[in-house]
């Protein structure tokens, strides 16, 4: 039997927008979300680094390609030890990106276009240059335990003081660092320059609610919460911190994977915190009106944990605990592999909560063209936009951008830079990203081929396929995904994925995706005649062509098509 799912790809077609039989859905449930890495989207002042004015100038593009909301990677004041994920002032914009006035202008323009703005919210830690940390080091009143501090353990053999536990940071090495001035260890789940805030302290939680309110008052539509699993740690009743057991996954005790992080990830208090923040946002909406404010949770956690973050029978949590399952697909993945990845989410999240979201990529992961191959970029875009729920696209994936080899210089090498290179707008100087003489990261050598301007003029380009997919989101068939039988998905062969979206009355879309490198012959898929409405570059079919699915059809290698049936 076919499994859940189905979303479509629409090309330039007339879509039925009647909503017969569709359930009420909130805006985020069927949204097209788009991540912008601000340093790399658009430079407005010629310094080679993207900024807020640049983003504002390009918001019309997001409207053009059908984006519902965009979330911005951190733009707050920061020494940039971790490119903005080390925040020294949660209430201001880093001068690299502009000013609060620039941000307000961006909000005004976004609202005029109907594009929602979501901010990256980094609550787990701050920069060690944040005034909160400086006050905590000095034990100033109210800030003494604003961060996680401990005396450590006395080594009976050496007489020296050792860290409180064997915990290892995400970036390797001890999670505890000695502060000479305070004469205590502080905790940092990430870099040493990113000390962890102490969320067991009510004052910390109040400060973070104040941060949320500050940006809500400026007009943002929600927050993507960074590093959710790391917010709380377990502490024993006697105040000590337990050692974590060895995982068996590695041989280097300084590597993060060496231990099983049962005391430093996904603690029960983190779930309660998500419920607290959701209640805060819902109350804000009740008092101020407008659409729902949304919470996205970045959590590389089990689906059972993500289910808890979403909510239970008595509490609501993050609307979109981010689903990274499709990011684990490779160039060798078959249609059956894709179904397995979909099932992992749907067997829990859809069954329990009737919710789904699908992430294509992000600033920490190689681009689709590198993970799966350039010939499969359109296939993944088709899949994530054909499945029920929200889709999350990393900037540039809609035009098939690839990683760039970035040479290590100086005393550091950021191995995530390859997927963070400037957006490719045109084939001109610096891809029209910047008027400067250089850009903060090098452009792809392929930018003259893969860019927005060029792809606008190619009917089956990745960009136009992407735009066609977004058009289908307003069709009655796509809006019926919460109705019984509104979608299904299955691997009809080892390599061919089929997704169906239907309102069960007057409209049905059938999406076929050939993940393999060989032709696929399909016989008797349905006793009806359909019409092709979208076909990728590898297809021999064209929009408007009829297809009798009671007969045989053939899919070329790496071909994806969308067919429509109307009563």
Curated annotation (Swiss-Prot):
SMART domains: Aamy (SM00642)
Highest taxon of source: Eukaryota
Site for Transition state stabilizer, residues: 364
Protein keywords: Glycoprotein, Glycosidase, Hydrolase, Signal
Active site residues of this protein: 226, 298
Biological process per Gene Ontology, one example term: carbohydrate metabolic process
Reactions performed catalytically: Hydrolysis of terminal, non-reducing (1->4)-linked alpha-D-glucose residues with release of alpha-D-glucose
GO molecular function: alpha-1,4-glucosidase activity
Glycosylation sites (chain numbering): 30, 124, 198, 312
Signal peptide: 1-23
Pfam assignment, any one: Alpha-amylase
EC number: 3.2.1.20
UniProt record similarity statement: Belongs to the glycosyl hydrolase 13 family.
Protein name: Maltase A2
């Amino acid at each position: 039997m076919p499994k859940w799912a189905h979303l479509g790809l629409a090309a330039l077609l007339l879509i039925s927008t009647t909503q017969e039989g569709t359930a009420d859905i909130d805006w985020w449930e069927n949204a097209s979300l788009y991540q912008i890495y601000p340093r790399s989207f658009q430079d407005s002042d010629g310094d080679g680094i993207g900024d807020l004015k640049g983003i504002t100038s390009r918001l019309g593009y997001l409207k053009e390609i059908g984006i519902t909301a965009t979330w911005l990677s951190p733009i707050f004041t920061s020494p940039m030890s971790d490119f903005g994920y080390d925040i020294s002032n949660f209430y201001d914009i880093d001068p690299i990106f502009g000013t609060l006035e620039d941000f307000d202008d961006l909000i005004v323009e976004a609202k005029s276009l109907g594009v929602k703005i979501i901010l990256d919210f980094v609550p787990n830690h701050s920069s060690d240059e944040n005034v909160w940390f400086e006050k905590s080091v000095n034990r100033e009143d109210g800030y003494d335990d604003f961060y996680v501090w401990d005396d450590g353990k006395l080594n009976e053999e050496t007489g020296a003081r050792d860290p409180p536990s064997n915990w290892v940071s995400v970036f390797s090495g001890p999670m505890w660092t000695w502060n000479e001035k305070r004469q205590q260890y502080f905790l940092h789940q990430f870099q040493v320059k990113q000390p962890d805030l102490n969320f067991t302290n009510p004052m910390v939680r109040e400060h973070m609610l104040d941060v949320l309110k500050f940006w809500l008052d400026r007009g943002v539509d929600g927050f993507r919460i960074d590093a959710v699993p790391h917010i709380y740690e377990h502490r024993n009743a006697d105040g000590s911190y337990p050692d974590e057991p060895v995982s068996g996954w590695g041989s280097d005790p300084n590597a993060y994977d060496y231990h099983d992080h049962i005391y430093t990830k996904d603690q029960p208090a983190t779930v309660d915190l998500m419920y607290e923040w959701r209640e805060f946002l819902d109350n804000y909406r009740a008092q101020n009106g407008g659409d729902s404010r949304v919470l996205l949770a970045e959590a590389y956690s089990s689906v059972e944990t993500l289910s808890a973050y979403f909510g239970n029978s008595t509490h609501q949590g993050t609307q979109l605990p981010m689903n990274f399952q499709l990011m684990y697909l490779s160039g060798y993945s078959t249609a059956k592999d894709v179904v397995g990845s979909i099932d992992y989410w749907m067997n829990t999240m859809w069954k329990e909560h009737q919710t789904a979201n699908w992430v294509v990529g992000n600033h920490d992961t190689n681009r689709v063209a590198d993970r799966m191959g350039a010939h499969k970029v359109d296939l993944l875009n088709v899949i994530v936009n054909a499945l029920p729920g929200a889709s999350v696209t990393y900037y540039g994936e809609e035009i098939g951008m690839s990683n760039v080899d970035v040479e290590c210089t100086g005393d550091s090498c950021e191995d995530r830079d390859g997927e963070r290179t400037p957006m490719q707008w045109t084939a001109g100087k610096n891809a029209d990203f910047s008027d400067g003489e250089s850009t903060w990261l090098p452009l792809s050598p392929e930018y003259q081929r893969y860019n927005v301007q060029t792809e606008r003029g190619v009917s089956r380009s990745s960009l136009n396929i992407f735009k066609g997919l977004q058009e289908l989101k307003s069709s009655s068939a796509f809006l019926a995904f919460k109705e019984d039988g509104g979608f299904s998905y299955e691997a009809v062969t080892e390599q061919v994925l089929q997704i169906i979206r239907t309102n069960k009355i007057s409209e049905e879309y059938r999406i076929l995706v050939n993940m393999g490198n060989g032709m696929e012959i399909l016989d008797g898929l349905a006793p009806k005649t359909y019409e092709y409405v979208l076909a990728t570059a590898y297809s021999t079919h064209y929009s408007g062509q009829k297809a009798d699915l009671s007969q045989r059809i053939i899919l070329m290698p790496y071909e994806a098509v969308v067919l429509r049936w109307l009563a």
